[in-house]
Swiss-Prot record:
Descriptive protein name: Enoyl-[acyl-carrier-protein] reductase [NADH]
Free-text function comment from the UniProt entry: Involved in the final reduction of the elongation cycle of fatty acid synthesis (FAS II). Catalyzes the reduction of a carbon-carbon double bond in an enoyl moiety that is covalently linked to an acyl carrier protein (ACP).
Binding site for NAD(+): 48-53, 74-75, 111-112, 139-140, 244, 273-275
Record-marked site positions (Plays an important role in discriminating NADH against NADPH): E75
Length: 398
């Protein structure tokens, strides 16, 4: 079938297998061109490995450090008549390229929040790898079923304490829109912490430690975004911020446990990028469009692969990691450059329906958004027939 992009709201409901493969190939080529990561990881578990930063973490480990990788995610296969999810095609492509290079790559498809997926992951590590020396936690999910109580939690994106007026781009109509977000209830805050806080990361590390599958000196990191004052009302000071603060608390206990084995645990702060998650946040398309404009003009623009490869090379495995006062690893310093933020802040209030394309890089934002789903990739023939039924040969289905 011939597959074209079909966008509904902030989700593209079609995906292109060949485009997803080309996107993965581009990221692999970036890593190979930058050269090996000195003293990098050798056996890596990535939880949330199929898109965005998690996929970039898997690619950087495999092609920057010749690491064996085990990826965990929750994706949907395609059929002859219906496309699967982008993460499915990304993983099929990643495994193909890794296998061609003689690298171990196996994936587990299921609910990473569940005990069943944790146990199956441990079985696969014991069988194939013995132990892992890096665990990357990069889950982005709207809901979580608690593995012990069975309670279902849903995350909410709201301010805390008071309503907030937000500017944003209505990405469908391409107009500037002001929205009011009402404050989260305590229940909504608690739910958001349960989904996006550090409890599940802690459960993963506890399970891996108990099973004896974490190597001496093993590291773990969870990815997060903090942002600057423009996004603080909705991020750091909002319901999601409560979850981020929980992550900062939980990492202390995890670090203590791993330190006993000569290892380490860190929260890694990454820059704002276009992801399926960020496109759902009312103000982020406008913020990202302005950020891209300013950072591209300065020559400091980066996407997922540049960020994560840099994080590995400079901080996770570098001699002089970029640490903040809270002990987090920082890869977002180019975004937080005062010159960049001041310029974004100035343009923020100047954008109108008439000058969106002039003052922002909204066209670059739209291209990046479509690239998530395998579209707008150079060299791909989008008029060609493509089979959406793509297999992942080594997939473990839970």
């Amino acid at each position: 079938m011939i597959i074209k992009p079909r966008v509904r709201g902030f989700i593209c409901v079609s995906t292109h297998p060949t485009g997803c493969e080309a996107n993965v190939r581009e990221q692999i080529e970036y890593v190979k061109a930058r050269g090996p990561i000195a003293n990098g990881p050798k056996k890596v578990l990535v939880i949330g490995a199929s898109t965005g930063y998690g996929l970039a973490a898997r690619i950087s480990a495999a092609f920057g450090s010749d690491a064996a990788t085990l990826g965990v995610f929750f994706e949907r296969a395609g059929s002859e008549t219906k496309a699967g999810t982008a993460g499915w095609y990304n993983t099929a492509a990643f495994e193909k390229f890794a296998t061609e290079q003689g690298l171990y790559a196996t994936s587990i498809n299921g609910d990473a929040f569940s005990d069943a997926v944790k146990q199956r992951t441990i079985e696969v590590i014991k069988r194939d790898l013995g132990q892992v020396d890096l665990v990357v936690y990069s889950l982005a999910a709207p809901k979580r079923t608690h593995p012990k109580s069975g309670e279902v939690f849903s995350s909410t994106l709201k301010p805390v304490g008071q309503a907030v007026n937000l500017r944003g781009i209505d990405t469908d109509k391409e107009v500037i829109r002001e929205t009011v977000l009402e404050p989260a209830t305590q229940d909504e805050i608690d739910h958001t912490v349960a989904v996006m806080g550090g409890e599940d990361w802690q459960m993963w590390i506890d399970a891996l430690l108990e099973a004896g599958v974490l190597a001496d000196g093993a590291k773990t990191t969870a990815f997060t975004y903090l942002g600057e004052k423009i996004t603080h009302d909705i991020y750091w000071n909002g319901s999601i911020g409560a979850a981020k603060k929980d992550l900062d608390q939980k990492v202390l206990g995890i670090r203590e446990k791993l330190a006993a084995k000569g290892g380490d645990a860190r929260v890694s702060v990454l820059k704002a990028v276009v992801t399926q998650a960020s496109s759902a946040i009312p103000m982020m398309p406008l913020y990202l469009s302005l950020l891209f404009k300013v950072m591209k003009e300065k020559g400091t623009h980066e996407g997922c692969i540049e960020q994560v490869y840099g994080l590995y090379k400079d901080s996770l495995y570098g001699a002089a990691p970029h640490l903040d006062d809270e002990g987090r690893l920082r890869a977002d310093y180019k975004e937080l450059d005062p010159e960049v933020q001041d310029r974004v802040q100035t343009l923020w209030s100047q954008v109108t329906n008439d000058n969106i394309y002039e003052l922002t890089d909204f066209s670059g934002y739209k291209t990046d958004f479509l690239r998530l789903f395998g579209f707008e990739i150079a060299g791909v023939d989008y008029e060609a027939d493509v089979n959406p039924d793509v297999q992942i040969p080594k997939l473990v289905q839970v």
